[in-house]
């Protein structure tokens, strides 16, 4: 995909319009493969109660978001509105104190001071004026994948019934994305409801699942 142009490791900004200078030469800007994955599973018990949880961790990997690629250009996400560093609406014309100041340097290495226009679909963050790398995110995450709370009936009750063990459990899955870097969506989301990795378009919000379980042993 397309990348930024760099000077001494800093992203270059066009001083005439405040936008990124795009390096149009196709190059590798990400890798869908994570550096590693891990899980933490633990169970805490007290008398007849047991609380177990599973935390999933992924470190590394990248995902390209077509949702922000087009979304930033259409002005849907929150970061395309609000106030800029001058306290003025981002979407006001630059001549009236609006616009956004992108982090980077001029081609000569001096600090960028030119604000980029955000008043139309042709803004500095959307598909027309930002490189693919701007919409490529770190796919790392930490998730509370599952929590289970179980209660085992005491023997004094079970002895009156034709069972050797009875337990009831409440289960929750995908309860909390503790940490992530991909904006507006689950890092594991793919193309719509599909499971394509490393590419998001029309990503459907992740859902929390709740269940109830009864276990009977004879």
Regions found by a protein language model. Name each.
Residues 48-53, 156-157:
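Repeated loop/turn-to-beta-strand initiation elements of outer-membrane beta-barrel proteins
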Residues 76, 88, 93-100, 105-110, ...:
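C-terminal beta-signal and terminal closure region of outer-membrane beta-barrel proteins
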Residues 60-162, 167:
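Extracytoplasmic gating/loop element in the C-terminal half of outer-membrane beta-barrel translocons
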Residues 36, 47-49, 140, 162-166, ...:
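Outer-envelope beta-barrel architecture signal
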Residues 45, 56-58, 171-175, 217:
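Outer-membrane beta-barrel pore domains and translocons
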Residues 53, 168-170, 214:
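Membrane-embedded beta-strand positions of outer-membrane beta-barrel proteins
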Residues 10, 14-35, 66-70, 109, ...:
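Outer-membrane beta-barrel domain signature, especially the mid-to-C-terminal portions
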Residues 39-41, 146-150, 211-213:
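Membrane-embedded beta-strand positions in outer-membrane beta-barrel channels/transporters
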């Amino acid at each position: 995909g397309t990348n930024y142009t760099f000077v001494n490791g800093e992203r270059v900004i066009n001083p005439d319009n405040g936008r990124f200078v795009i390096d149009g030469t196709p190059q590798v800007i990400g890798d869908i493969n994570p550096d590693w994955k891990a899980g933490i599973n633990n169970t805490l018990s007290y008398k007849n109660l047991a609380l177990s949880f599973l935390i999933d961790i992924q470190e590394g990997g990248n995902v390209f978001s077509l949702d922000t690629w087009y979304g930033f250009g259409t002005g849907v996400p929150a970061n395309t509105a609000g106030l800029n560093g001058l306290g003025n609406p981002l979407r006001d014309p630059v001549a009236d104190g609006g616009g956004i100041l992108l982090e980077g340097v001029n081609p000569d290495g001096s600090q960028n001071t030119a604000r980029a226009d955000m008043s139309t679909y042709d803004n500095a963050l959307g598909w027309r004026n930002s490189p693919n790398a701007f919409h490529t995110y770190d796919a790392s995450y930490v998730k509370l994948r599952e929590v289970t709370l179980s209660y085992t009936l005491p023997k004094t009750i079970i002895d009156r019934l034709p069972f050797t063990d009875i337990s009831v459990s409440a289960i929750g899955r995908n309860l909390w994305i503790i940490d992530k870097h991909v904006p507006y969506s689950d890092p594991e989301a793919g193309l719509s409801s599909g499971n394509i990795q490393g590419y998001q378009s029309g990503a459907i919000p992740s859902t929390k699942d709740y269940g109830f379980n009864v276990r009977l042993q004879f």
